[in-house]
Swiss-Prot record:
Renumbered residue ranges of the record's region Alpha C-terminal domain (alpha-CTD): 282-374
Upper taxonomic lineage: Bacteria, Pseudomonadati, Pseudomonadota, Alphaproteobacteria, Rickettsiales
Positions of the UniProt region annotated as Alpha N-terminal domain (alpha-NTD): 1-270
Keyword Phosphoprotein: no
Protein name: DNA-directed RNA polymerase subunit alpha
Organism field: Ehrlichia ruminantium (strain Welgevonden)
GO cellular component: cytoplasm; DNA-directed RNA polymerase complex
Protein family according to the UniProt entry: Belongs to the RNA polymerase alpha chain family.
Enzymatic reactions: RNA(n) + a ribonucleoside 5'-triphosphate = RNA(n+1) + diphosphate
Length: 374
């Protein structure tokens, strides 16, 4: 598949200043770091579990720039499904069985069905990548994965899984070979003995399909989010179900880390060498620069802005020192306006009821002007 787009005009219009670009030496144009620093980043990631099931959860990420929820959601979902590592049975030895195209006396299922059931065993190893599990059962009975004894370094996660049914008074002895991997590896891909990681492959060794992925389901949906009165932002809701070997939020974090590692290879510049880089306001101003912004810069509704103006609240630094009770005592200021202001402050990592020493500063006008120039 070929994805192509003529983006030369887009690069010029956006002021892109890549390494070696003719725009990078233009002093009056956009700083390189503005391309990522000036984008809206999520102010919260909320994990909502499905009842008491710790392996099922929705992760709500907002606000995101328009279009970013689809981009990030698709990338995270694909990486979670394909690239997270887990453990699986990749081969077995069944007593008196030389290949999978046979049946066992006294066992209801044939060997092919038994192998299919074994491939669905979910387990977790601790401190090792390989292990051989043994199971010895005497019929008649149902053989389930929970009959494999837990050890300090191995935990069976789905103990009710049916492996086979012994209809007669027969012995069923099996060894299961476990290792770590990613994705799905069918038995037909394990043609080479070296791929098994075994020094001496038994004559009755039978390869099985191995599903290593710890993710059972992963999906996402995109909704609208808002900052103040602007609603053209995205909310990403990721629904993840795991096999209990990891938690849903851990799965998303691992997928993000994999993407971070892959994307790092595309960055061909050193941020510390950026030309004409201005000093960050936070390094030279005695206050958080957001506190020095005037409230009329915020995208507030007319009612909320007029309430602040009538209460002589000029700077955000004045606003955050008010408590919610103080604000609700302001004439014409209600819960809707309070929620609006709380959302805007949260997007700047601020909140009502803050204590700011030595506020307001004597030179607040000059400091505010310095911030606006930055």
């Amino acid at each position: 598949m070929i994805f192509d787009e003529d983006s030369s005009s887009v690069a010029q219009e956006s002021g892109y200043m890549g390494v070696g670009s003719p725009y990078s030496s233009d002093v009056g144009r956009i700083s390189m770091s503005d391309h990522w620093n000036k984008l809206t980043k999520p102010s919260s990631i909320k994990v909502v579990n499905h009842g008491n099931a710790l392996n099922k959860a929705d992760l709500i990420i907002e606000p995101l720039e328009s279009g970013f929820a689809l981009t990030l959601g698709n990338a995270l979902r694909r990486v979670m499904m394909s690239s997270l590592r887990g453990f699986a049975v990749y081969g077995v030895e069944i007593e008196n069985v030389l290949h999978e195209f046979t049946s066992i006396s006294g066992v209801r299922e044939d060997v092919t069905d038994i192998l299919l059931n074994i491939s669905m065993i979910r387990l977790k190893l601790s401190g090792m990548d390989n292990k051989v599990l043994s199971l010895k059962v005497k019929g008649p009975c149902e053989v389930r994965s929970g009959m494999i004894a837990d050890t300090p370094d191995c935990t069976i996660l789905n103990k009710d899984l049916l492996i086979c049914t012994l209809d007669q008074d027969v012995d069923f002895n099996i060894k299961m070979y476990v290792n770590s991997g990613k994705g799905y590896v069918p038995a037909v891909k394990r043609k080479s003995i070296n791929k098994f990681g075994l020094n001496d492959v038994p004559v009755n060794f039978i390869a099985t399909n191995a599903l290593y992925s710890p993710i059972k389901k992963a999906s996402f949906r995109v909704e609208s989010s808002r900052i103040g009165q602007f609603t053209d932002y995205d909310r990403l809701i990721m629904s993840v179900e795991t096999d209990h070997s990891i938690l849903p939020d851990e799965a998303v974090a691992l997928a993000a880390r994999i993407l971070q590692d892959q994307f790092q290879q595309f960055i061909n510049f050193d941020e510390t060498d950026e030309p004409h880089q201005k000093v960050d306001t936070k390094d030279v101003l005695p206050y958080d620069s957001n506190l020095l912004r005037k409230v009329d810069e915020l995208e507030l509704s007319v009612r909320s802005y007029n309430c602040l103006k009538n209460d002589n609240i000029t700077y955000i630094g004045d606003l955050v020192q008010k408590t919610e009770s103080d604000m609700l005592r302001t004439p014409n200021f209600g819960r809707k306006s309070l929620n609006e202001i709380n959302e805007l402050l949260a997007s700047m990592n601020l909140h009502l009821g803050m204590k700011i020493a030595n506020w307001p500063p004597e030179s607040i006008e000059s400091l505010s002007k310095q911030y606006s120039e930055e």
